[in-house]
UniProtKB/Swiss-Prot annotation:
Biased composition (Pro residues): 386-395, 406-416, 1081-1091
Keywords: Developmental protein, DNA-binding, Isopeptide bond, Metal-binding, Nucleus, Phosphoprotein, Repeat, Transcription, Transcription regulation, Ubl conjugation, Zinc, Zinc-finger
Gene from which the chain derives: Casz1
Organism: Mus musculus (Mouse)
Molecular function (Gene Ontology), one example: zinc ion binding
Protein origin, superkingdom: Eukaryota
Function statement: Transcription factor involved in vascular assembly and morphogenesis through direct transcriptional regulation of EGFL7.
UniProt protein name: Zinc finger protein castor homolog 1
GO annotations of cellular component type: nucleus
Biased composition (Low complexity): 1659-1685, 1741-1750
Amino acid sequence: MDLGTAESTRCTDPPAGKPPMAAKRKGGLKLNAICAKLSRQVVVEKGAEAGSQAEGSPLHPRDKERSGPESGVSRAPRSEEDKRRAVIEKWVNGEYCEDPAPTPVLGRIARDQELPPEGVYMVQPQGCSDEEDHAEEPSKDNSVLEEKESDGTASKDDSGPSTRQASGETSSLRDYAASTMTEFLGMFGYDDQNTRDELAKKISFEKPHAGSTPEVAASSMLPSSEDTLSKRARFSKYEEYIRKLKAGEQLPWPAHGSKAEDRAGKEVVGPLPSLRLPSNTAHLETKATILPLPSHSSVQMQNLVARASKYDFFIHKLKTGENLRPQNGSTYKKPSKYDLENVKYLHLFKPGEGSPDMGGAIAFKTGKVGRPSKYDVRGIQKPGPTKIPPAPSLVPTPLTNVPSAPSTPGPGPEPPASLSFNTPEYLKSTFSKTDSITTGTVSTVKNGLPTDKPAVTEDVNIYQKYIARFSGSQHCGHIHCAYQYREHYHCLDPECNYQRFTSKQDVIRHYNMHKKRDNSLQHGFMRFSPLDDCSVYYHGCHLNGKSTHYHCMQVGCNKVYTSTSDVMTHENFHKKNTQLINDGFQRFRATEDCGTADCQFYGQKTTHFHCRRPGCTFTFKNKCDIEKHKSYHIKDDAYAKDGFKKFYKYEECKYEGCMYSKATNHFHCIRAGCGFTFTSTSQMTSHKRKHERRHIRSSGALGLPASLLGAKDTEHEESSNDDLVDFSALSSKNSSLSASPTSQQSSASLAAAAAATTAEAIPSATKPPNSKMAGLLPQGLSGSIPLALALSNSGLPTTTPYFPLLPNRGSASLPVGSPGLLGSMSSGATTSATPDMPALMASRAGDSAPTAATSLSVPPASIIERISASKGLISPMMARLAAAALKPSATFDPGSGQQPTPTKFPQAQVKQEPDSAGTPGPHEASQDRSLDLTVKDPSNESNGHAVSANSSLLSSLMNKMSQGNPSLESFLSIKTEAEGSPAGEPSPFLGKAVKALVQEKLSEPWKVYLRRFGTKDFCDAQCDFLHKAHFHCVVEECGALFSTLDGAIKHANFHFRTEGGTAKGTPEASFPTSAAETKPPLAPSSLPAPPGTMVAGSSLEGPAPSPVSVPSTPTLLAWKQLASTIPQMPQIPSSVPHLPTSPLATTSLESAKPQVKPGFLQFQDNDPCLATDCKYASKFHFHCLFGNCKYVCKTSGKAESHCLDHINPSNSLVNVRDQFAYYSLQCLCPNQHCEFRMRGHYHCLRTGCYFVTNITTKLPWHIKKHEKAERRAANGFKYFTKREECGRLGCKYNQVNSHFHCIREGCQFSFLLKHQMTSHARKHMRRMLGKNFDRVPPSQGPPSLMDAETDEGMDYTGCSPGAASSESSTMDRSCSSTPVGNESTAAGNTISMPTASGAKKRFWIIEDMSPFGKRRKTASSRKMLDEGMMLEGFRRFDLYEDCKDTACQFSLKVTHYHCTRENCGYKFCGRTHMYKHAQHHDRVDNLVLDDFKRFKASLSCHFADCPFSGTSTHFHCLRCRFRCTDSTKVTAHRKHHGKQDVISAAGFCQFSSSADCAVPDCKYKLKCSHFHCTYPGCRHTVVGMSQMDSHKRKHEKQERGEPPAASPGAPVNLDGSLTLAAEQGSLLFLQTAAAGLGLLGDTGDPGPPVTASGTRDGPAAPTPAAAATTTTTTTATATATAGESSQEDDEELELPEEEAEDDDEDDDEEDDDDEDDDDDDDDEDLRTDSEESLPEAAGEAGARTPLAALGGPGPAPTAAS
């Protein structure tokens, strides 16, 4: 079938036609519009032609030339077109007859070509149709393209009508639907179907001479029935483009408009290509195309704005080769004024289809049609990057034409970048930011402009987006327009039939309609006016054709509104839903069915939320739970990245047979083949290191690639660590001394940065991980995994590294197991080994000589380099494994051209400067790694305490040196010619020292103190490790026993420290004898961040286990010399070629600019500290650089003394063994409950101290603690942690907060904050010395001691051993001594007064790189944990001890504890829970006091008829039968009792408005809450408690015999109803009523049985009048009865955040995972939102009033009868 295109014609007949025609017009439909519709008719060609053309038969060359862009389509014969056109024109003008007369028509056309334009023209200006919206080849002068007729009669300057070339021929206005033709034929009376069929026969290709009846003209446009007509699709010019391009045909896209113009005069374009309609009939729809004429003024045409069409975006995509999904198979939906294709995530289909329940025609979901809902997250979850379908904006943005620039086709929006599921961009809301539906509308107009804007030119108006203005000198281009050359307006929207306006008010009205419609789309609504038919999209709408209304376009939503305010409100609802979806939740309102039968809220008609994350079934109804649950998933993801899965006590463990399931929080290792289970996060790091060591051993720790080691039987288990991912690079906040968040780089940027300096770079983050934890890990984690140094075999996914890589590290993944590792490490290549790319060619990168990558003999020095690449992030065991492979002869000649880096000292990982252009040299390329500045090495941790990886402090310092670049050995040399010497030449000093260390590698210092026994060695018959590899300490009276080398080295280190370093040392390591020859300290501003500064700064990280630094023990002289020499680095200019300065800037060494002192980093005021949580941040202070020491201080004196303590550990330090008792298996500990009874450990011998530990490094710290306490006591104060019993009666802080006591005689002052110590001490001094005490200089009085005390108390508790004694003399040192190095300043030599506590931040020591800021358990924070003593109320059961509790899941399985308190029954593992649970009982005791009793859910309360017994944790009032599950009601009920006590004490009884007081004629009965006096013979009634007191005093005066005060006439009988006289029964009745009704709480449980006269009803709230008259005179009394809990709560509210930062002794030792959830039920009963207070009567709902809860008078308590 063809779409025939009529030639342009000119009709001289009057446009109005004959008078009878005008009478037949319907609804004001102008004949010119009808003629325009009929000017281009679609007719049916012969069946054979239609079939061949539908198949796209090839054309002859001549036909191809004539067809222009529509190649492949044949043309209809000219004569047939002329005949058909003549018939139509004659018929429209009423002149049609049986005989066709095409020739006169053609002749008339030819004769009238030179006449002025009159009659009917097919003219269209630019901007009036979507042909020119995105014209594919706009002409340079923006004029309309011309065409000549095929006979060539028209000349080039002919101004007559002509057809367009290219896209102009194929365009048919989509607004002319079949319904228009039906209306037209009906207007002419052709309603009979037979008549229409006859008309179809008259004008058809089967009868080329035309028929004899006028019906022929329209029959081809009519469907067989009205139903098919309504479902028929309409087509525009672009749909044919899309069809042709999808079919693989080529469309010529002329590059220049001028070329198209040239062709326009020579080519004649054929008819439109064939299109296949969705209808089954052979009829085609009417299509009318307005042909353009050249405009009189191209400038005026440029002022018209082209409309953007919905199809331009798709044409742009098809031109670029992209595919479009079919819509409804091979058919297309009906285009309309609502650009539904540009609406994001709507399900679209043909009109009339779909489910009405789903919101009409656009909500039906099919597999082929439409897009997923914006809420449909589950359908698009994929862990890898996915291609997101493009989502254009809701409304096409119009193109603006300016006179100076021709209109150009608007490029389609680029498809968005690939996003993974968990990126928030995927679900960004498409809701508009428009304020209102009416935004942008106009109310008044002046000359086509808004009144507030001046007219720029006459032709410019704000309506040009929708309406075009034509002046009197312009031709509008519409052939039937009767207002040619008169000022008028046309709508640019074909949907509006290019409606014409002459009134500016009509223009405003029409513009406002379009603006509101577009705004509605922006807000997600379709706007329909009364003239619009919304049934096409929303059939069955009751507002259709009645009023303006808005339909919500969201999938599944069928809301319709008539008010714009309702529209905005509904939009906010969808916005909230979208935000919830972005957060991973879905909300179901009370009227919505969540469809989840196992949901706890299913069928409850309540608003609730579901978590949408895979595998999570969590449901909740409180919004406050959203953030909590989000944090749960964040933690879960972090644990999963570390290889663990946490299960909470309230969830069932997925591991079968787990004894911790639903009992306590615990962890499972989810590595393949590992079944380790633990309860404390402190075990996580050690277990992680265990897998690490095992993996390194199996993957080639000795330098062999994994591919050369051969497969092992345990390969699956050994490689299970592939799933481990360190979380370090995801959270810079917790890498204390690393980089700031701004220095983090994505994996893509890391790969890009690495590619700049390497020959081959493969960003490994694009490869999906082969996760073995797929069942437990959330999807989408791989997208957030950073590049890192992955030590594994080549099969390890490089996106899941094990070792943490700091965010500023510049290299991409380097799989150590790959064969090309050694070459890539030495050349700086960043390769990623994958199963299909073994990275064998990686060693080619850089200019270095290739190394023997595939050889079995690997240079041992490369092992050092590989291990140092992770810098302190591997364990000492791995370091020694690598050291075992070292050969002293394996060295490189620096001058041989080979890479000098792998010599004894590995290179510093310093980023290359970006401006170092060109190919990096051998030295530069090897430096493309960044510096690691972590606080501590997690892998060097044992039992939560960081220790040095090697045996001595010399080893620690040598580690720092070993991580330096070999080009930086001038930093360590005392000679100053390093600046001029070649950077790659190692200094003689370094060569000698390192050579000595390597040669002495076997003389490890632990051999001095310990002896190793192998599996065949016999040590002792009673040794626990007999016939196993272990170590015995040979020091007298020690007897320590170790099964690992780690423990042996640590123990030897302890002995070395305690014995003053007297172990034999090797004198070969000759160090410089003086520091005077070194250059002055490097100025901070001399270099951005010199590598030398980084070498010294890297000491902050903690010792890296470099194998070359294990051996010899130093002498004291060497210590002092080395400590004073190493940090003093000569300044190296940035011009040194092989020393590129590091761009490491973000809050690191460059911006902090610390001055390196001997063993210290000094920070000036306002310098950003490297430690993000440093309590002295932005102040003048010092950080210790020795080993793992975390000491920080504010004075240079303390810094110097602390440094000396490191250099000489025996400096005024008594032997620690004199103050501790050591117990081992040979000498068992006398304490049966000691935690370390079966191991070697120490007990403190101080009186009253129960400290016990098996970690020797804690002993000096503990001594310091005692000395600190002694100094504090000398100043008159004592400190207690919140876990210590202070013993002072009435102390409100006892076991509640860490606090201080003044221990001066007669002073009971207790306080929380350390700075109060100074002010309180000054108060005592003023009392002793008088008011003038303040004038005493601080240096001469006790306040200086206080300053020293407070300042010293803020030092790190994790300071090095040996610092204890120095603290006692800090006052003298700080005032007298001069710091080492020429850095003496006044600020460094004086003691600063402590500032406000608000400026003191606690310095948490980060334990790992998790995103939760986990705090390492410093020795002080684990005080109670290490003391080994049992808290009162608990009992410990050893591993093989039967607890004889049948309900205990831990019995005979693990060491555990039982709470022995009444009605508790809590059982747990791990001592941490003991202190938390004890605090829980303290809170509960403060809550229940002596008038309530608490019962856990697991225990029976033994109260009859209690529904909570054994099911819920609940409370029972001991004064009445009230019970509740909500802890907040306990206090309220207690206040109620207090109020009732006050009422009873005043001699009154309360009755609520719902309780019958049984007093005849009481005017308050059953009306409001009131009170009756219970005094015998008194009939007084009051409504407020304020009146009770005066009435009570009157009775007291009567009892004393005083005359009553004058009163205005019988005030006693206010209601005249109380006639009790002195009867005994009356008083008994009121007292009984008071007893039965006065104790109502939350439930109103029935009290004792009452007499028949005392019926009890549920209480009601008092009336407003009664409430207004009440007062709170009993507030004080009620508060007093509330107990001490409220007082303590109020005081706790006043506590600042630093409530007890002293000594860090009060640091919470609870694990991070335990802080969120209390043990078992801890606070679930203290902070619940349950509404269960067990009301026993319906009327009891109003029992408690806010006034009663506040302590004021409430309603009289009653109980249900």
